[in-house]
């Protein structure tokens, strides 16, 4: 069962992306490189609690 997760920019703290993840198969936090509209560059985004 996939749950919705929110991705937060590690640079500015903006939460601009939603994604889905199966928390039973992958219990660790997800980190992805995504475009941050506030920073106007690609930054590291981490899954929030």
Curated annotation (Swiss-Prot):
Q: Which InterPro entries match?
A: Ribosomal_bL33 (IPR001705), Ribosomal_bL33_CS (IPR018264), Ribosomal_bL33_sf (IPR038584), Ribosomal_zn-bd (IPR011332)
| Keyword flag Cell membrane | no
Note whether Cell cycle occurs among the keywords.
no
Q: Which UniProt keywords apply?
A: Ribonucleoprotein, Ribosomal protein
Q: Look up the domain of life of the source.
A: Bacteria
Could you tell me one molecular function GO term of this UniProt entry?
A: structural constituent of ribosome
A Gene Ontology term for the protein's cellular component = ribonucleoprotein complex
Q: Choose any GO biological process term that the UniProt entry carries and state it.
A: translation
The record, for Pfam families, names: Ribosomal_L33
Family (UniProt) = Belongs to the bacterial ribosomal protein bL33 family.
Task: Show the HAMAP family listed in the entry.
Answer: Ribosomal_bL33
What protein does this entry describe? Large ribosomal subunit protein bL33A
Q: Which organism is it from?
A: Lactobacillus delbrueckii subsp. bulgaricus (strain ATCC 11842 / DSM 20081 / BCRC 10696 / JCM 1002 / NBRC 13953 / NCIMB 11778 / NCTC 12712 / WDCM 00102 / Lb 14)
